[in-house]
């Protein structure tokens, strides 16, 4: 994936967008990239909590955009992995404080002058000003979707908005997949989701209780675990870096085997 400024979006809240941003940021850093993750969900800040960094927040995104702090003062370095930094959202301001043009300048500054290889932008749910700001500097997008009808419908709307903004390098992350439910016909399959939305999946994240456990502990799963979701997040980070990583059976169950064949076909027989 050539895009260096990537917005992580969904349309619908509660699909695992923030957890995905944290794990992909940490995964890319683990693989050697210098990564900034930015929380644009002003007023509902939680990327700092998911990453276990809430106790170290001094300045936030709005402080930087309004000139009260320099980017370096607001960026929090994650001590558990080299080269991972968080720029937290403001908890007190509302989304009207966001300025898309200034945000675009900030992301450009991080990539061109602060030496970051990649900036991942955690977009707020919805399509209002928060999304418009988060998408302003983006060259690519990761659309996080759960395999359920309402999530897919919202994702379809977001994909249309991304294309209208001429953000072209867009991929799906299908989150919380349960192969047994798919096999019973109680959940949309990967094939269904891909067919409806017309985007290639770059990550398939299985339902995994370790995601909730690590989030509650303020630990990023990809840095500590070898559970199915941790492996899937790291594989996704590798694909973002351009590696050809086959979709594997992540210790799911035999129902997943058919799914893996579908994915390999989608990715041209890898």
Predicted regions and their residues:
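Phosphate-binding P-loop
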Residues: 1-3
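Conserved beta-strand scaffold positions in the cores of enzyme catalytic domains, especially
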Residues: 5, 86, 201-204
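Walker A/P-loop NTP-binding active-site region of P-loop NTPases
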Residues: 5-70
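Flexible glycine-/small-residue-rich
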Residues: 10, 39, 88-91, 123, ...
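P-loop/Walker-type NTP enzyme "switch/lid" segment
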Residues: 42-117, 213-217, 222
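Conserved catalytic-core segment of NTP-binding enzymes
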Residues: 102-105, 109-113, 118-213
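C-terminal lobe/tail of nucleotide-utilizing enzymes
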Residues: 164-270
């Amino acid at each position: 994936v050539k895009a260096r400024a990537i917005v992580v979006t969904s349309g619908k809240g509660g699909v695992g967008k923030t957890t995905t941003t944290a794990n992909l940021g940490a995964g890319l850093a683990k693989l050697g990239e210098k990564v900034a993750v930015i929380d644009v969900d002003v007023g509902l800040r939680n990327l700092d909590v998911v990453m276990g960094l809430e106790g170290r927040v001094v300045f936030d995104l709005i402080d930087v955009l309004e000139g009260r702090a320099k980017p370096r003062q607001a960026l929090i370095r994650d001590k558990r992995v080299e080269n991972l930094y968080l720029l937290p959202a403001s908890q007190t301001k509302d989304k009207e404080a966001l300025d898309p043009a200034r945000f675009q300048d900030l992301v450009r500054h991080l990539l061109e002058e602060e030496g970051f290889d990649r900036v991942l932008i955690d977009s707020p749910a919805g399509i209002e000003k928060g999304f418009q700001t988060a998408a302003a500097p983006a060259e690519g997008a990761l659309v996080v979707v759960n395999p359920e009808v309402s999530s897919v419908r919202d994702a379809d709307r977001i994909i249309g908005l991304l294309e209208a903004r001429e953000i072209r390098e867009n991929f799906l992350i299908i989150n919380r997949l349960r192969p047994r439910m798919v096999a019973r016909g109680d959940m949309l399959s990967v094939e269904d989701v891909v067919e409806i939305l017309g985007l290639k999946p770059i990550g398939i994240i299985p339902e995994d209780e370790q995601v909730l456990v690590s989030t509650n502990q303020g630990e990023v799963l990809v840095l500590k675990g070898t559970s199915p979701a941790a492996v899937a997040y790291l594989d996704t980070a590798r694909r973002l870096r351009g590696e050809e990583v086959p979709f594997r059976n992540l210790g799911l169950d035999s129902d997943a085997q058919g799914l893996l064949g579908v994915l390999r076909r989608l990715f041209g027989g890898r």
